[in-house]
Amino acid sequence: MGRQNVVVVFGLVFLAVLGLAAAASSPSPSASPSKAPSTSTPEVEAPVSEDTIGTTDDDAAASPGDDDVAVAGPLGSDSSYGSNGPSGSADSADSGAAALGVSAVVVGVTSIVGSFLFF
């Protein structure tokens, strides 16, 4: 039983040291100069156009029954999709769920191998 505790403690200490080493790594050098530029440029807002999201023809807030609303409906509703509905299963292989399945397999194999150390 004592040997198992030593292995667990050693593993936890190893992970802690590894985490501290990763957190303490120096940042990569940047190509930008360390001094501030001698001339400052004023910050300018982009001009508002009809293509900007959330703009209407007037300054008044649009009412729900108004034809001049900026958003057709709540995000994710059928009216907000229009002709651009949610994508099908064509990109399902590139989704995060596939990566989650791989990590679940790795965790399962690791737990089985780890059980041999304790039993």
Swiss-Prot record:
GO terms for cellular component: membrane. Residues 119 are cytoplasmic. It is a single-pass type I membrane protein. Residues 24-42, 82-95 have a biased composition (Low complexity). It comes from Brassica campestris. This is Anther-specific protein BCP1. The gene is BCP1. Residues 1-23 form the signal peptide. Residues 56-69 have a biased composition (Acidic residues). The chain crosses the membrane at residues 99-118. The keyword Transmembrane applies. Its main location: membrane.
